[in-house]
Amino acid sequence: MRIGLFTDTYFPQVSGVSTSIRTLKEELEKEGHEVYIFTTTDRDVKRFEDPTIIRLPSVPFVSFTDRRVVYRGLISSYKIAKHYNLDIIHTQTEFSLGLLGKMIGKALRIPVVHTYHTQYEDYVSYIANGKIIRPSMVKPLLRGYLKDLDGVICPSRIVLNLLEGYEVTIPKRVIPTGIPLEKYIRDDITAEEVTNLKAELGIAGDETMLLSLSRISYEKNIQAIINQMPAILAENAKIKLIIVGNGPYLQDLKHLAMQLEVDKHVTFTGMVPHDKVALYYKACDFFISASTSETQGLTYIESLASGTPIIAHGNPYLDDVVTDKMFGTLYYAETDLTDAVIDAILKTPVMDKRLLAKKRYEISAQHFGKSIYTFYLDTLIARNSKEAQKLSLYLNHSGKSSSLKLVQGAIHLPKRAAKVTAITSVKVVKAPIKLVHAIKDFLD
């Protein structure tokens, strides 16, 4: 299958969406499919570096200068998509590249599906201080974008419930993003490495290590954990909170920890190298998060893949993930956070290897890729079925002469198909030599 992914965000822009798209591309390619990403230009990467990544002219997005939107490239994108003979388009944004993907899909008469990644009500206030898009505008804008698509993928039940509340009627399917397990299982990490890291962080052997790992922003609600630290320490003084990451809210959190006089039990590490993240997951006793704005949250399943249980503010997504006490403890009000931490420390059982192996497959990139491909197949079958019904209606309402022409045309189809296949095969053989030059010609 030949798939076009259309996104405003891709590496080197780091985000959960970028990670999800790269994971999907890699998993589909492992199964022999061709995947082409249509995205924005970036000054930190060469435009024609990878022939499977088509970068279109773009400018920084208002209020988010590290994010970009395309300002031209419709004709060139159409030519490239036609050249690659795409079977399906999968949009990952409702903005510039998403709209572009919809138009190209319509022009090529191929299915277009979408993944809804972001709950915009939580973020519209950051776009020109909420003067351009207000929360009340999200529903009609999203319904307008989705109404003529062939299907939408929901990364969690949170998104499914949201879209059903918006009365979105197109086919919907819950498919959480998976992760590459090999990056987090990491049996090569030794007990000595874990001990050394804890020593560096000032954690004694009899102390419990809680790990928060995320971008340090107000929405992540790390302040809720720090606010509860006095009460947590009153119950159990042998607890240390390690906060990994960087962001605009870092200094506020440091000040809060000092103000509450818990700074000796709260350590801020800043960013850590990506190849060290698994070590932190392995070293901690629990991964903790108080965020209420996540539609899924990859850090939760990264922790579980590492074999570490979580403590988190519950939601429909986590209800589906934490299916056993050994996987974690959920709470549903901030006032219950202290009790959740103490309960987790006292009552979390040892991980059962069989159940952990099953859970790891559920959250794996492999399972994610296969689930998306199945959705693509179902979408193509549904589209072909609709077209067949239209053809049937046409035949039933047309005269005998029209039917005869269709039959006569069908007689010559095998010859035409053979000829097209032969021509396509020659093009495929020549493609590797001319591919990069062809893309440059299209885009210039």
Regions found by a protein language model. Give the residues of each.
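Carbohydrate-associated surface elements
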Residues: T41, I158, G178
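Conserved acidic donor-binding segment of nucleotide-sugar-dependent glycosyltransferases
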Residues: D324-T335, D343-P349
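Conserved donor-binding/catalytic core segment of Leloir-type glycosyltransferases
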Residues: A204-K220, I226-M229
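Short hydrophobic beta-strand element within catalytic cores of glycosyltransferases
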Residues: P309-A312
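N-terminal subdomain of nucleotide-sugar transferases
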Residues: M1-V45, E49-R55, S403-D444
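A charged, aromatic-enriched C-terminal amphipathic alpha-helix characteristic of glycosyltransferases
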Residues: V350-S402
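Short alpha-helical donor nucleotide-sugar binding micro-motif in glycosyltransferases
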Residues: A81, Y145-L146, M271-V272, L279-C284
